[in-house]
């Protein structure tokens, strides 16, 4: 989904509202073309690690070519199912413009996997399209308001920030 949101979001606002440090390990789940994974890469430095996960084999194949010899590891996968990532190994999971496509059972799988891979006190950041009529995007009934999102994701709610006219980011913390 990264291709969809690239250029529509205020990346500086997103990055300013995430506590990213050198040496962090970040998962860009549903990374699409990897544009945010690349931004995260520079922030975590040589001691950090970025995992870029997407079910689109073509997008991952292209991204792998682009990020050879970097701290980004791209692989095909689905964050609503168990991944090959180690338990309690991730400082930040970033999910942008993907949550609205999850079914109820996929949300359950997503929450289970997120809780498994996040370190204690680590962050989950979800960027969603606002639940209002917009000139693009999924039908309004597929979208979640911040309140609905908080009910679906049983982590500690932290920051809620507008990241463009039509998008918001909710940051959660793993207890």
Predicted region positions:
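Conserved Class I S-adenosyl-L-methionine
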Residues: 137-157
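Conserved beta-strand signature within the Rossmann-like core of class I S-adenosyl-L-methionine
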Residues: 121-128
């Amino acid at each position: 989904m990264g291709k969809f949101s690239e250029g529509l979001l205020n990346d500086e606002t997103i990055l300013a509202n995430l506590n990213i440090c050198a040496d962090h390990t970040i998962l860009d789940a549903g990374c699409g073309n990897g544009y945010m994974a690349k931004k995260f890469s520079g922030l975590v430095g040589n001691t950090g690690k970025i995992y870029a996960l997407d079910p689109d084999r073509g997008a991952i194949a292209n991204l792998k070519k682009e990020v050879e010899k970097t701290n980004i590891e791209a692989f095909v996968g689905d964050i609503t199912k168990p991944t090959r990532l180690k338990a309690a190994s991730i400082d930040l999971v970033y999910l942008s413009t993907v949550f609205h496509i999850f079914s109820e059972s996929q949300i359950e799988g997503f929450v289970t996997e997120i809780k498994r891979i996040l370190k204690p006190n680590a962050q989950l950041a979800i960027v969603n399209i606002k639940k209002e009529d917009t000139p693009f995007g999924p039908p309004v009934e597929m979208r979640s308001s911040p309140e609905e999102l908080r009910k679906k994701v049983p982590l500690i709610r932290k920051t809620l920030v507008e990241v463009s006219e039509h998008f918001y980011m909710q940051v959660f913390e793993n207890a």
